[in-house]
Amino acid sequence: MEMEEGASGVGEKIKIGVCVMEKKVFSAPMGEILDRLQSFGEFEILHFGDKVILEDPIESWPICDCLIAFHSSGYPLEKAQAYAALRKPFLVNELDPQYLLHDRRKVYEHLEMYGIPVPRYACVNRKVPNQDLHYFVEEEDFVEVHGERFWKPFVEKPVNGDDHSIMIYYPSSAGGGMKELFRKIGNRSSEFHPDVRRVRREGSYIYEEFMATGGTDVKVYTVGPEYAHAEARKSPVVDGVVMRNTDGKEVRYPVLLTPAEKQMAREVCIAFRQAVCGFDLLRSEGCSYVCDVNGWSFVKNSYKYYDDAACVLRKMCLDAKAPHLSSTLPPTLPWKVNEPVQSNEGLTRQGSGIIGTFGQSEELRCVIAVVRHGDRTPKQKVKLKVTEEKLLNLMLKYNGGKPRAETKLKSAVQLQDLLDATRMLVPRTRPGRESDSDAEDLEHAEKLRQVKAVLEEGGHFSGIYRKVQLKPLKWVKIPKSDGDGEEERPVEALMVLKYGGVLTHAGRKQAEELGRYFRNNMYPGEGTGLLRLHSTYRHDLKIYSSDEGRVQMSAAAFAKGLLDLEGQLTPILVSLVSKDSSMLDGLDNASIEMEAAKARLNEIVTSGTKMIDDDQVSSEDFPWMTDGAGLPPNAHELLRELVKLTKNVTEQVRLLAMDEDENLTEPYDIIPPYDQAKALGKTNIDSDRIASGLPCGSEGFLLMFARWIKLARDLYNERKDRFDITQIPDVYDSCKYDLLHNSHLDLKGLDELFKVAQLLADGVIPNEYGINPQQKLKIGSKIARRLMGKILIDLRNTREEALSVAELKESQEQVLSLSASQREDRNSQPKLFINSDELRRPGTGDKDEDDDKETKYRLDPKYANVKTPERHVRTRLYFTSESHIHSLMNVLRYCNLDESLLGEESLICQNALERLCKTKELDYMSYIVLRLFENTEVSLEDPKRFRIELTFSRGADLSPLRNNDDEAETLLREHTLPIMGPERLQEVGSCLSLETMEKMVRPFAMPAEDFPPASTPVGFSGYFSKSAAVLERLVNLFHNYKNSSSNGRS
C-alpha cells in the first residue's frame, strides 16, 4: 500500500488535495499555511483548480489522502460530497454539516443541542414576503414572537446565512432609528438610518437580544478541537468605520480566551465537525455567547497563527493517515532555518504622572473621572390644574381607567394624543392681547398655550426630554353606565409638563473635545497609547451615566472623542454607555438636610446679615469655614435688583412673542419628519434661524417668553412681598443660556442681569449643598455615598490586579523553568489546548474581584505593539449632574472634619482649598479625576506602592466673553465655551497613598458588601486568578516549539 511505503520513509508523500475555489486557494493566509505544510517534506499539495471542480467528473479528480474542501460562492458542494464518498480521503472539514452553516436557524439549533451558549433569540418564518403572522407583534419599542418579547435595542438577522444585511433597532428613549451592518465596503461596515423604526417583513428573520460588548467584537479561529486563536476588532455597531493600519489592513489584536471560551471553541469545532472553523463571540456582562459560525476561516496577517496552524494540520494529517509516524516537531521549524534570531529588547517601561513621578518605575493603573454633562437648554416645568373633559379622558385612557391613578405620558403616540386635545382647548389669541379680565383664566390659557407650543416644538416627539404627568385631585360619584350603583370619576387633575434640559450643539462639542483631551493627556503613549490599550483589551473601560438624556448623550459624545469614533451618537450610546440611576441620579437621600440648608440660606440672604458662630475659626484664614461662605455681603440689595432686571428682560421677550406668527405651527395635521438631531440635542447651529432673528435651537419666542415670565413670577411674589431664592440658579441658568446662544437678539440689560445673577448664584448654589463645611460633608456623603463606594471598589480591584501581576511574574519564571526541563523528556507533541476543568480552579483574588460585577479579559502580551506589555489600565467614567459633582467634591475637601478622622490632614492641600473657595461654579463639563499609579521599585507591602493623584476642572469658562476681542466674537458665533484644564488638588511632589485615601473617604462610602452580588459565569475564575492565568500563558505562549519561535515574525 502507498501509506505503508510512506511509513518506511521511501514511498510517496502524503497527498493533500485542495478542492477549493481558486479565489480562496490563492488568498494570503491559505498560501502561507500550505507553504509551511509543504516545507515539512512529508506532504504533496494537489490543487484541483476551478476548471476541474466545476467541469470535470469526480472520477477524473486527483486522488488524495487528505482533502481540504469547503463551500464558498459558486462551489458545487454536492460534487465534493460525491468525490469524498468515492475516494474516502481524510476530511479536514466534514462536508455534510456545511449545509447547516447556510441557515442561521440551524446554526443556533445545533449550538443549543451541544449546550453552547447563544443570545436569547426567536425565529419569524414567512412562506411569502409580507406574510402576516399571528404570533408576531410589533410595537414602538419591542417586537413579540410567540409571546417572547424583545425590547429595543434588538438585532434582526436574515435566516439565510449568506445574507449579511443585519439590522439593529434602537429604542425611542435613545432617539430611535436603525443601524444596518454589512460586509465591509471600503472603510465602512455599517450605516445608521435615523428614520427607520419598523422591522423588515419581506422574509424570514431571527430576532435576538442586543448585547453590549464595550464596542469590541471577538473572532475565534479553531484549527482542530485543541487549538483556538482569538482576535479583537472594533465592532461595526459603534460607528461603522473600519480601523485600518498603514498597510490598509483592518486592525485586529490577539486576545486570550477564558477557560470557558476555550471549551466553547472546542465544542463548536466538534459540533459542526469543522476542524478549521471561525466563529463570532460576544462578551457581555461576564458571560460569552456564540452568535455566528462561519466555517472555514483563517486569521489574516498573523505569522504566529500561520506557524501554529501548519503544525496542527500536520499532526492531524499524520494521525489520520500515518499514525505510526512521529508527529514530534523538529527542533527548528523548517521555514525558520535561515532566519536570523531576533532580539527581545525594546520593551521598556514608561513613566507617567502630571504631578511628579517615581521615575521610570511608575505605571499608570487606573483613571477614574466623574464628569458633569455638557451645555444644555434651560430645564422647564409647567404646572396647571385641568378640569377639561378631553384631558381627564386622556388620563383615564392611559392609566387603565383607574379614577385615582396618575399617568405618565412619554411615548410619541401618547404625546400626540395630548397635543390633539390641547389644540382644541387653546384660545386662538396671541400672548399679551387677551381681553379676559379674570387673571386665573388668563394664566390658565397662557399655560395651555405653552403646553401646546412645547408639544409642537421641533415637529416630533422624543421621550428623552419631554414628559407629562397627570395626577387626579378631585372626584365625584356618578351612576354607572349599566345603572348598577355608582362609580368615581375625576373632575380635576394636576398636569405637570417637564421639558428642556436638552444637550445643545455646544454641549455635544464640549463633551467630544473633552474626550479627545483625555485621550491625549490622561494616558501614556503620545496620544495613541490609549487607543492601543483599548483595542487590545488591556484597557478595561466602563462608562456609566445617569438616566437623564443630556447626561447620556454627553457620555456618548465623550466616548466618541476618547476612542476616536465616527458617526451618530445613538449607536455609541447603546454600545458603550451603561445607565446607573441609583448611583448617579437623585437627591432623595439628602432631601431633608438640603431643605434645612435652603431655609437657613434664605434667612441669611433675605435678612441681609451673615450669621457666624462664635466658635468658628477665623474667617480671614479659612473663609470657607463660615456659614454661607461665598455669599455677597449685599445679597439682599442684589436680590431686589435681580427682580427689576428680570422683569425688564421678560417684557422685551413678551413683545417679541406678541409678534410671532402663530401660523408657523399650522396646519395642525402636518407634522414634519422625525429629526434625530433635535431629539437628542442639536448637532449644529441652525444658522438660518439665527440669521432670521429667531432664538437658537427649536425654541420659539412664545416658549422663550414662557420661560422668562415663569422666572419673574416665581422669583418674587408681589402680593406677599416674598422672594424665592431657590429661583436664583434658574434665573442665572436662563441668563447664561441667552447670553451665549441668543446674543443676536440684542436683549437690553441682559449683560447687567447676568452679572447680578452670577454674584448671587455663586453664593447660593454651593450653599444649597450645605451652609457650612460640616453640613456640606453630611449632605455630600448622602448624595454621593453609592458613587464613592463604587470608586473605592474600582481602586481596590485595580490594586489587587496589579499585585497579582507582580506575584504572577515570579510564578511565570518558575513555570518557564519547569516547562523547559519537562520538554526535554517528551517524545510527542503536548496538547495545544488544556482541558478547561484544569483552568477553573478558583484564584485567591476571586472574591474581591467579583464585587465589581465587571467583565475582565487578558491580552496576549507577546503580540501587543506597545512599549510596556504588562500594562493594564482600568478606566471608569461616571457622567452625572451638578449635584453629584458638588457632593463628591465636598466629601474630598472636608472628610477630615468628621469626628472619626479628627487630627487627620485634609486630602486637599491648603492652596487648593483656597482656590476651591474662589471657584464658585462647577459649570458644564466640570470634572474630578483620580489617577492611580503604581511604583514597582518599592516592596508590595509599602504604602507608597500605590499613590493617588487628584485633579479637578471647573468646566466651561465664561471669562472670555467679558472681553470684546476676536476670541469672544468667535465663541459667541459658535455658542461654545472652552473647558478649563485640570488643576491640582495636592502639592507638587506630594504622595497621597491609596491606603490613606481609603481611610479618609471610607466612612462616607457605601460598603462593598452592600452592593448587589456579582454573578460569575461558569468556568470564569476571575481576571488574575493565579492558576488560570499561569496555565493561560502556557497555552498561548509556550508551545513545544518555543525554543524556535523567537525567530518568528510578528
Curated annotation (Swiss-Prot):
Pfam families: His_Phos_2, PPIP5K2_N. Belongs to the histidine acid phosphatase family. VIP1 subfamily. Its EC number is 2.7.4.24. Residues 355-429 are annotated as: Polyphosphoinositide-binding domain. GO terms for molecular function: 5-diphosphoinositol pentakisphosphate 1-kinase activity; ATP binding; diphosphoinositol pentakisphosphate kinase activity; inositol hexakisphosphate 1-kinase activity; inositol hexakisphosphate kinase activity. One of its GO terms (biological process) is positive regulation of antifungal innate immune response. Residues 817-855 are annotated as: Disordered. This is Inositol hexakisphosphate and diphosphoinositol-pentakisphosphate kinase VIP1. ATP binds at residues 104, 157, 164, 183, 208-211, 217-219, 235, 280, 292-294. It catalyses: 1D-myo-inositol hexakisphosphate + ATP = 1-diphospho-1D-myo-inositol 2,3,4,5,6-pentakisphosphate + ADP; 5-diphospho-1D-myo-inositol 1,2,3,4,6-pentakisphosphate + ATP + H(+) = 1,5-bis(diphospho)-1D-myo-inositol 2,3,4,6-tetrakisphosphate + ADP. InterPro entries: Acid_Pase_AS (IPR033379), His_Pase_clade-2 (IPR000560), His_Pase_VIP1 (IPR037446), His_PPase_superfam (IPR029033), VIP1_N (IPR040557). Mostly expressed in vegetative tissues (e.g. leaves and stems), and, to a lower extent, in roots, shoots and reproductive tissues (e.g. flowers and siliques). Also present in mature pollen. The keyword Cell inner membrane does not apply. Bifunctional inositol kinase that acts in concert with the IP6K kinases to synthesize the diphosphate group-containing inositol pyrophosphates diphosphoinositol pentakisphosphate, PP-InsP5, and bis-diphosphoinositol tetrakisphosphate, (PP)2-InsP4. PP-InsP5 and (PP)2-InsP4, also respectively called InsP7 and InsP8, may regulate a variety of cellular processes, including apoptosis, vesicle trafficking, cytoskeletal dynamics, and exocytosis. Phosphorylates inositol hexakisphosphate (InsP6) at position 1 to produce PP-InsP5 which is in turn phosphorylated by IP6Ks to produce (PP)2-InsP4. Residues 837-846 have a biased composition (Basic and acidic residues). It comes from Arabidopsis thaliana. The modification N-acetylmethionine is found at M1. Disruption phenotype: Abnormal accumulation of InsP7 and reduced levels of InsP8. Increased weight increase of P.rapae and M.brassicae larvae feeded on mutant plants thus leading to a reduced resistance. Increased susceptibility to the necrotrophic fungi B.cinerea and A.brassicicola. Increased levels of jasmonic acid (JA) and bioactive conjugates such as JA-Leu/Ile and JA-Val upon mechanical wounding, but reduced induction of JA-responsive genes in challenged mutant plants.
